[in-house]
């Protein structure tokens, strides 16, 4: 996948870059593998905003992705590589020998027509899925489960890759894309390889309108608000925040303050914090 840069025909194209779609082989999704999911717009079940700066954006059909990879012992052939508006990674449609079709995350280097397999003794090749205790040390993996049978939750974004660095007892040690090193049950499953579309991190939006297409609303700085709206607000002209450290709109410490719950059960599974 390459990156397309634009000449400054307009202010919006001056700094814009976007991914090329030369890898995409199909433009329309498989109908029975899609569903319509109402968009939350950052609201909870009571209509209260729980995640700010969300709303609007282009309509989307949700693609049902197979994160569990639980079709054991049945070979599947990669039929298409498709765009998914719900994530920055590409997806691949797999035709299995029993006639079923499923979407999976597209790993980097997977070719059309290539066969993949999910099994306890599957070969260590790109796209295959197997338990962590069956994967050799140093192997690059993605779509990793946190609990056996729950489906992949770690290393799913474009270009993400984790590495298996140790095995001991009932756990294996993983180096995650964030730099965190943590323990995961050896019975959890993972997929071999790196998630595709690795150039995603180098793209620039270019204009505010594209953020609106993606469902991202504007972010207003607290320092330009009134005191009734934000602790940083108020003052005469361009005044400083008037505090020893920045805080959230609700007065909690922000920008660098650790907010992870110290009593969370998984604290003992984290060997080194993320960077």
Curated annotation (Swiss-Prot):
Output the PROSITE patterns linked to this UniProt entry.
Answer: RIBOSOMAL_L2
UniProt KW keywords: Chloroplast, Plastid, Ribonucleoprotein, Ribosomal protein
One BP annotation, GO = mitochondrial translation
Q: Which InterPro entries does the annotation name?
A: NA-bd_OB-fold, Rib_uL2_dom2, Ribosomal_uL2, Ribosomal_uL2_bac/org-type, Ribosomal_uL2_C, Ribosomal_uL2_CS, Ribosomal_uL2_dom3, Ribosomal_uL2_RNA-bd_dom
The source's domain of life comes to Eukaryota
Q: What is its main location?
A: plastid
What the entry lists under Pfam families is as follows: Ribosomal_L2, Ribosomal_L2_C
- Localization terms from the record: Plastid, Chloroplast
One function term, GO molecular function aspect: transferase activity
Q: Where is this region: Disordered?
A: 223-255
Asked whether the UniProt record includes Repressor among its keywords, one would answer no
Question: Which cysteines are disulphide-bonded?
Answer: none
Listed GO CC annotations? chloroplast; mitochondrial large ribosomal subunit
Q: Does the keyword Chloroplast apply?
A: yes
Q: Which residues form a coiled coil?
A: none
What the entry lists under HAMAP family is as follows: Ribosomal_uL2_B
Question: Self-association or partners: how does it assemble?
Answer: Part of the 50S ribosomal subunit.
Task: Please state which protein family the record places this protein in.
Answer: Belongs to the universal ribosomal protein uL2 family.
Q: What is this protein called?
A: Large ribosomal subunit protein uL2c
Gene from which this protein is expressed: rpl2
